[in-house]
Amino acid sequence: MARIAGVDLPRDKRVEVALTYIYGIGRPKSNMILAATGVNPDTRVRDLTEDEVNRLRDYIDKNVVVEGDLRREVSLNIKRLMEIGCYRGLRHRRGLPVRGQRTKTNARTRKGPRRTVGVRRKK
């Protein structure tokens, strides 16, 4: 099993798909990496030579921000938005959608389950 950027790639998948198991690498970036390193995208991970695995590992380490570094960068960006008090930062702080979606109805994923407001009756 090939281990790249701290992630074990599945042996039975094509390299093009297997690279997408690494956080920060999707299909387009996977194809770009394979073209740059000269590895055939149709090769199965189990059939990769040690040299090909090392080329992929070196290229990803030097040229692509992945896994922990990328997660840290994203969380720091969100934290920065919250600190400067911009609109997007306020939406993050309140747990509401950030990209302009409606919130009168929907947005349940971001807002969480409904809180039913009870009615108090006079006695």
Swiss-Prot record:
Keyword Ribosomal protein: yes
Domain of life: Bacteria
GO cellular component terms given for this protein: cytosol; small ribosomal subunit
Keyword list, A-Z: Ribonucleoprotein, Ribosomal protein, RNA-binding, rRNA-binding, tRNA-binding
Pfam families: Ribosomal_S13
Region (Disordered): 97-123
InterPro entries per record: Rbsml_uS13_C (IPR027437), Ribosomal_uS13 (IPR001892), Ribosomal_uS13-like_H2TH (IPR010979), Ribosomal_uS13_bac-type (IPR019980), Ribosomal_uS13_CS (IPR018269)
GO biological process: translation
Any one GO MF annotation of this record: structural constituent of ribosome
Function: Located at the top of the head of the 30S subunit, it contacts several helices of the 16S rRNA. In the 70S ribosome it contacts the 23S rRNA (bridge B1a) and protein L5 of the 50S subunit (bridge B1b), connecting the 2 subunits; these bridges are implicated in subunit movement. Contacts the tRNAs in the A and P-sites.
Quaternary context: Part of the 30S ribosomal subunit. Forms a loose heterodimer with protein S19. Forms two bridges to the 50S subunit in the 70S ribosome.
Family note: Belongs to the universal ribosomal protein uS13 family.
Protein name: Small ribosomal subunit protein uS13
Annotated organism of origin: Moorella thermoacetica (strain ATCC 39073 / JCM 9320)
